Amino acid sequence: MVALEVALRNNPTKGHIAKSLKELNYDFVFIDTPPSLNSLTLDALISSDGTLIPLQCEYYSLEGITSLVNTINELTNSGLTNNKIFGIIRTMVDKRNNLTKDVSDDLEKYFPKLLFNTLIPRNVKLAEAPSFGLAGTNYMPESCGAKAY
C-alpha cells in the first residue's frame, strides 16, 4: 500500500484521463493499458468506473492478476475510485496444451465470480492485425479470434 501511495503522489499525469473523459459524450470508453502498474495505468484505473481484465492463460499472468485485483481493491477502499472489476476474460487460449487447463483451473478456483465463460483462442490473424494498423476484428473479421471477440 505504501508503494501505491508513493506512486500516486508522484504521478504527474494523475487526473488527466478523468478530465479528458468528462469532455466526451459516450456511454462506454475502453482504455487499453499496458500490463504493468505504471502511472498511466494507475490513472486509468482511478478514472474508470469498471475494469475488464484480459488474461493470457500463462502462469506469469496469474501472478499479475492477483496484484492487479489487489491494487484496484486498494484504490477503491481508499476512496480514490469507484472502479468495479467487471470480470476476467481468458485470451490467447490454446486448448491443445495443459497449461491453458491448469491456468483456467486456478482462475476458477481463485476468481470464480469474476471469470467469464468466453475463451478467446490464440489466433495468428489477431497477432498480425497491429502490423497493418488495424484491430483484429477489422483486419480479419471472419477469423476465429475476431469472432470470439
List where the protein language model places each region.
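P-loop/Walker-type NTP enzyme "switch/lid" segment
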Residues: 1-27, 129-132
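C-terminal boundary of histidine-terminating zinc-finger modules
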Residues: 128-148
